[in-house]
């Protein structure tokens, strides 16, 4: 039996010390037979093969019929045509009707393995010929003055690759696993050619595409087809209203509208409202037709009839029961997904569904197990093909009026995630100093199950920072995590706007190039940092100017009538959310990542060039330009002796804090000149740290050209050697007062860390101490090194292995090998 020792000391307001040791994981997942069968069926659907979307075809059909009509009306009619035309399907075992499968059916023209190999060879040969012809063509970023383009130029010109995991393998003509195999084959075949591995991956992922051609061009060029994604669509309001009442409201607004622009908006709103209502009514008919025609049991026929009756009712009347509320929520969600929606969020589902659950329990209609079965169905629906786009759920926190919001449905949702064992939805658990103890206990139980959920979000940090953006106390109290980690107000904001991501480490390159041109500019480390901050300011300003251009393009061209129908403010203002109609402003996220790499690199510059004078600027510049070839001893010293972020070392943590503080202030300052929207700083890298790292040169911390940068707010891979407490202390050292967009800190734990009750309590205390001392966010996941390494060799044995990538989870076998290796290289706590 393992003895568990726990010691928790709060050293300072923002410092914690926790010693933990424990062994072996907890109880087995509890699924009833229906959910087991439903899960297996959905996994089989995901593994069935390549899927072709019919969105472009349906939209193009409508656009051909509406030439000459106003853009907003054409957009609404195209969406209505999609809902009217798409095939509706009924799946085995499900208790929630509605699926995207009719929109994305299996693609028939998949190449054979031999054809894939031959086509890939042709693609690479043509690429190499082009490279040989064009003497100025450069297939990789060079670290030095001869490099004419900035990092941002290279990224925006699509120098990097993208398909690092299966769910972003959009519009592909071969399966992701086949793409990985053919890439591997070509890397081996051309290992001696003038081509980098990432170039091979990039060219092949672009080449193996389904030829949508004119349909896709028409969809995106005629309107353009812009839509709300990374958004919550006010499901709580809608399930209490129903479509009939909403349609009546739209008609009332339309009858009173005198302004032509408002009248056009209401006409578009009426088209999509009626289309949504008709889609759900048609699903009731589809279910009943299936019931009559399919060879199914009487019990199954009764279940199908219940779904049909709920669909029929909730179109015309508000939901009365938990089952009705969750079914209508899913229908609203699937309708938005039909137009290509991505990262749609259920937001605070334990708040708006809880009254229905509470009422049903009191009246004897449902118990916790039955509620969990329905939630399990919802969790699994989110994991169906083409639905797996980081759709989020937010739990816990406080109510709009500041009271504890955790309830029995919060617990059931967390237990559902643990039992179902799927990557989505992405759960954000809001926590604060007033939370009941059971909330942390349930969070650790869920994480222990290996599902990668939940992430913890600190109410005290995010509510305060939302108020700094100008939000009311009530709206700030109501925040949710959209998609991965991004912070928004539910039901009141248009979609999340994305700026060009800023790689903190790459900006060092520009400073070094400036020194090469003008050595007199850098005499001290302060001089170096002044130039570095100037690069940060320039990158932030470039993002602002890019948004100005995007906004000019969006004006009077970009509309999403369906999402605008459901977002607060649009009906009242008579204006689409993308044209400024929403109650709350759009957030434009200035992403930045690689804090570990940049902090370590700047610390190396300070220590070895300016403090100890062991390296000259010329030597460092030359070493980086040559990727440490001929400078192996220098690289070894940098790797061994540079203080690394993530170990609780003030020397390097101070630098990390200075960089982040400057960046956050620069982003916040953009709001002084932004007229309507808000600019927010988001310390999160999705998987940018991989594909940006692949095309970037060496860095002063000893990292070589092409290697990954550090992940989001995490340390450089494997360099946090002093345990989880020191890592969290480094994070607590950073000033997060102006972090307004989002934050991702990954925390990988061996499952043996979470055995026995004492081990669980130790982790609870660690997380609670971190939150109470001001930690903004943390996401833990359990895995062991043996499983990760074996899954690279025998993926078929590890189909259900889930890992945290950035601010989201994914099956490990659905990641490309470079991303898999980066996750393996992260420190695994509790292994020894």
Per-segment meaning from a language model:
Residues 278, 282-285, 289, 306:
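Extended, non-transmembrane alpha-helical coiled-coils
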Residues 293-295:
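A conserved hydrophobic secondary-structure block that centers on an alpha-helix together
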Residues 6, 20-22:
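Short hydrophobic alpha-helical segments enriched in small aliphatic residues
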Residues 16-18:
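Short, low-complexity S/T/E/D/G/P-rich linear segments that nucleate or cap local secondary structure
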Residues 267-278, 282:
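Extended non-globular scaffold/tether segments
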Residues 25-266, 299, 303-305, 310, ...:
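Conserved catalytic cores of very large enzyme subunits
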């Amino acid at each position: 039996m393992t003895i568990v020792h726990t010691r928790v000391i709060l050293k300072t307001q923002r410092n914690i010390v926790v010693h933990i040791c424990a062994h072996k994981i907890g109880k087995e997942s509890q699924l009833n037979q229906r959910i087991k069968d439903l899960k297996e069926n959905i996994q089989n659907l995901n593994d069935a093969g390549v899927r072709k979307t019919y969105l472009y075809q349906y939209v193009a059909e409508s656009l051909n019929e509406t030439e000459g009509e106003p853009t907003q009306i054409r957009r609404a009619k195209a969406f209505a045509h999609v809902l009217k035309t798409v095939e509706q399907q009924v799946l085995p075992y499900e208790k929630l009707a509605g699926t995207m499968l009719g929109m994305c059916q299996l693609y028939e023209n998949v190449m054979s393995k031999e054809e894939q190999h031959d086509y890939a060879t042709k693609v690479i040969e043509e690429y190499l010929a082009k490279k040989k012809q064009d003497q100025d063509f450069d297939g990789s970023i060079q670290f030095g003055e001869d490099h004419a383009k900035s990092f941002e130029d290279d990224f925006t010109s699509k120098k990097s690759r993208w398909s690092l995991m299966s769910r972003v393998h959009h519009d592909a003509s071969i399966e992701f696993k086949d793409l990985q195999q053919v890439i591997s084959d070509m890397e081996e075949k051309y290992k001696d050619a003038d081509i980098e591995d990432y170039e091979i991956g990039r060219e092949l992922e672009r080449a193996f595409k389904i030829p949508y051609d004119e349909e896709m061009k028409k969809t995106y060029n005629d309107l353009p087809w812009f839509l709300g994604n990374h958004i919550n669509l006010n499901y709580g309001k809608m399930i209490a209203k129903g479509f009939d009442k909403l349609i009546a409201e739209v008609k009332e607004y339309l009858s009173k509208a005198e302004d032509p622009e408002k009248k056009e908006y209401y006409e578009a709103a009426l088209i999509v409202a009626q289309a949504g209502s008709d889609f759900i009514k048609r699903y009731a008919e589809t279910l009943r037709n299936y019931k009559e025609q399919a060879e199914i049991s009487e019990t199954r026929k009764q279940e199908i009839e219940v779904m049909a009756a709920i669909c029929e009712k909730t179109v015309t009347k508000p939901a009365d029961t938990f089952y009705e509320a969750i079914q209508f929520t899913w229908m609203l969600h699937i309708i938005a997904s039909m137009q290509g929606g991505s990262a749609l969020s259920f937001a605070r589902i334990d708040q708006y569904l809880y009254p229905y659950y509470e009422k049903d329990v009191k009246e004897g209609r449902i118990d916790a197990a039955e509620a969990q079965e329905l939630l399990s169905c919802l969790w699994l629906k989110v994991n169906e093909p083409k639905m797996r786009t980081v759709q989020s759920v937010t739990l816990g926190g406080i109510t709009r009026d500041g009271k504890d919001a955790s309830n029995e449905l919060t617990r059931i949702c967390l237990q559902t995630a643990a039992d179902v064992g799927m990557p989505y939805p992405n759960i954000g658990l809001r926590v604060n100093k007033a939370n009941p103890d059971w909330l942390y206990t349930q969070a650790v139980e869920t994480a222990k199950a290996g599902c990668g959920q939940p992430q913890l979000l600190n109410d005290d940090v995010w509510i305060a920072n939302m108020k700094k953006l100008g939000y009311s106390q009530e709206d700030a109290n109501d925040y949710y995590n959209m998609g991965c980690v991004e912070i928004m107000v539910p039901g009141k904001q248009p979609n999340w706007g994305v700026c060009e991501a800023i790689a903190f480490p790459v900006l060092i390159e520009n400073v070094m190039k400036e020194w090469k041109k003008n050595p007199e500019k850098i005499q001290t480390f302060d001089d170096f940092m002044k130039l570095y901050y100037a690069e940060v300011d320039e990158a932030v300003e470039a993002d602002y100017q890019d948004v100005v251009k995007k906004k000019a393009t969006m004006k009077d061209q970009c509309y999403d009538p369906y999402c605008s129908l459901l977002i607060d403010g649009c009906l009242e203002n008579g204006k689409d959310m993308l044209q400024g109609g929403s109650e709350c402003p759009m957030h434009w996220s200035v992403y930045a990542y690689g804090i570990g790499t940049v902090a370590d690199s700047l610390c190396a510059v300070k220590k070895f060039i300016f403090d100890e004078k062991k390296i000259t600027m010329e030597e460092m510049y030359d070493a980086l330009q040559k990727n440490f070839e001929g400078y192996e001893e220098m690289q070894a010293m940098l790797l061994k002796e540079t203080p690394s972020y993530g170990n609780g070392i003030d020397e390097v943590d101070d630098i990390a804090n200075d960089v982040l503080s400057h960046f956050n202030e620069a982003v916040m300052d953009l709001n002084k000149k932004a007229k309507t929207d808000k600019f927010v700083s988001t310390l999160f890298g999705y998987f940018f740290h991989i594909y940006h790292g692949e095309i970037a040169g060496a860095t002063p911390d000893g990292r070589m050209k092409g290697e990954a940068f550090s992940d989001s707010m995490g340390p450089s891979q494997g360099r946090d050697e002093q345990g989880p407490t020191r890592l969290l202390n480094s994070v607590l050292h950073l000033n997060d007062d102006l972090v307004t967009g989002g934050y991702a800190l990954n925390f990988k734990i061996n499952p043996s860390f979470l055995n026995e009750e004492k081990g669980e309590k130790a982790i609870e205390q660690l997380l609670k101490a971190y939150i109470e001392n001001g930690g903004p966010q943390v996401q833990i996941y359990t895995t062991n090194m043996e499983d990760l390494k074996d899954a690279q060799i025998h993926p078929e044995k590890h189909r259900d292995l889930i890992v945290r990538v950035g601010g989201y989870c994914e099956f490990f076998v659905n990641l490309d090998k470079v991303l898999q290796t980066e996750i393996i290289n992260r420190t695994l706590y509790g292994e020894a």
